[in-house]
Amino acid sequence: MDAVLEPFPADRLFPGSSFLDLGDLNESDFLNNAHFPEHLDHFVENMEDFSNDLFSSFFDDPVLDEKSALLDMELDSPAPGIQAEHSYSLSGDSAPQSPLVPVKMEDTTQDVEHGAWALGNKLCSIMVKQEQSPELPVDPLAASSAMAAAAAMATPPLLGLSPMPRLPIPHQAPGEMTQLPVIKAEPPEMSQFLKVTPEDLVQMPPTPPSSHGSDSDGSQSPRSLPPSSPVRPMARSSTAISTSPLLTAPHKLQGTSGPLLLTEEEKRTLIAEGYPIPTKLPLTKAEEKALKRVRRKIKNKISAQESRRKKKEYVECLEKKVETYTSENNELWKKVETLETANRTLLQQLQKLQTLVTSKISRPYKMAATQTGTCLMVAALCFVLVLGSLVPCLPAFSSGSMTVKEDPIAADSVYAASQMPSRSLLFYDDGAGSWEDGRGALLPVEPPEGWELKPGGPAEQRPQDHLRHDRADSIHETTKYLRETWPEDTDDNGTSPNFSHPEWFHDRDLGPNTTIKLS
């Protein structure tokens, strides 16, 4: 074991025996009082109720019936309400986790002045510290008590102990009873509290994770609090050092006699709360309870300071971000204004260019459009001329009655019976006279023989004049009915070629060239 032990006077603590009878102790007693590592500290809270019983069992053992002067102190277990020290003490797990906060360091010589019980089997070690009395002689048999706890879990109650090598003990004057200020290296997970000035409040550590609201949660009695092993602080001595702790080290409250040195913060808080300031050990129950309450308030104060510090840092960070974003926004606005100005300038230049281009190119376009229209008109005129030249080549059409002219020689065959019945269109000429006139020309009727005509009268000359006048019209009338086929039977409104009277022919001298033949 690496624990440094301070020898006890064996002739007074263990008279007549060279070993410690551990028959009344069992494995659970040592485990319940063991100081577990950081990741097992939550087991300690459930097992702290057995710590006072274990500590009292060392002195209630039958071997120790003869009490010495050192054992005349009060060994009564504290009240249930204050079974544990506060979680913000040096033995708790509420050490400041911030690496920026300086931590109080004590010299390793403090460990030499105190003895320790150590469990070297598994997890922990139990150290029992006792201040050396200058008038008591040093006995090498005291070292044998350090080996009793090492084999308590694996051996019978009675154990053979072997002496351990001891480190040299610093020399003290016979009348020197006060404890000198020392510096001790502690691990960063141990609770360290600093007394700082108001301007240093920003550098307070973060809120301890093990702070609780209950009165006895996370606290231990000063006399039942086991200090940590001196080997662990030696390995972690690289932490920062400060010179003004806010709370008194818990191992200083474990002494059974001697003066009690409290920090200025604790004294001020005790006075403010109306409690008396304890000056010597051991502490009474009332003093212990008051001191516990004061330490808890100091810890809450530290937590509040840390919370304010974090909030202040957060607000400062936000303010810096706001300033940065504001500057970036202003720069972006300037860029936007520059781009808008450039855009307006480019638009003006574009309008000027469009005006110039329109003024120079519009005239040729108009001329080209005029030339195109002229060409189209010329092409249309040429087409009309060509079409007009082709019109005389077409067959001639009559513009008046649209009648068909035929040779007069074919007039004799007008009423020839056709071999096949057919229909023909009838054309009527308004200027050619009525149909009855033509009919009269075709069928002239001579007056009866009894008519007397005066020579040279109008009645005598009328037939000849009429026939001469209608000669040309008869030819025209016959052409209107070319190849006309008359039906055999017609109605009353029609005209049939079959007359009701017998056909008769009458020859009349109408002229040398006039011949009328009816068939």
Curated annotation (Swiss-Prot):
Q: What happens when the gene is disrupted?
A: Mutant mice are born at the expected Mendelian rate, but show growth retardation. They exhibit severe osteopenia, involving a decrease in type I collagen in the bone matrix and a decline in the activity of osteoblasts. Osteoblasts show abnormally expanded rough endoplasmic reticulum, containing of a large amount of bone matrix proteins, including COL1A1 and osteocalcin/BGLAP.
Q: What segment(s) does the record annotate as region Basic motif?
A: 292-321
Ranges of compositional bias, category Polar residues: 236-246
Entry keyword ATP-binding: no
Q: How is it modified after translation?
A: N-glycosylated.
Q: What induces it?
A: Up-regulated in astrocytes residing in or close to CNS lesions, such as cryo-injured cerebral cortex and stab-injured spinal cord. Up-regulated by ER stress in astrocytes (at protein level). This induction is accompanied by increased proteolytic cleavage that releases the N-terminal transcription factor domain. Induced in astrocytes upon DNA damage. Up-regulated by BMP2 and RUNX2 in calvaria osteoblasts. This induction at the transcript and protein levels is accompanied by increased proteolytic cleavage that releases the N-terminal transcription factor domain, possibly through mild ER stress.
Instruction: Name the membrane topology term.
Output: Single-pass type II membrane protein
A single Pfam family, by name?
bZIP_1
Outline the segment boundaries, as ranges, of region: Leucine-zipper.
332-353
Give the residue range of the signal peptide. Answer: none
bZIP domain span: 290-353
Gene3D superfamilies in alphabetical order: 1.20.5.170
**Which residues face the membrane's Lumenal side?**
398-519
**Where does the sequence pass through the membrane?**
377-397
Q: Cellular location of this protein?
A: Endoplasmic reticulum membrane
Query: Where do the record's region annotations for Required for transcription activation lie?
Result: 1-60
Instruction: Name the site position(s) for Cleavage.
Output: 426-427
Q: Where is this cross-link: Glycyl lysine isopeptide (Lys-Gly) (interchain with G-Cter in SUMO2)?
A: 184
Query: Which ranges belong to the motif S1P recognition?
Result: 423-426
Q: How does it assemble?
A: Interacts with SMAD4, the interaction takes place upon TGFB1 induction and SMAD4 acts as a CREB3L1 coactivator to induce the expression of genes involved in assembly of collagen extracellular matrix.
- Which family is it part of? Belongs to the bZIP family. ATF subfamily.
For this entry, the protein name equals Cyclic AMP-responsive element-binding protein 3-like protein 1
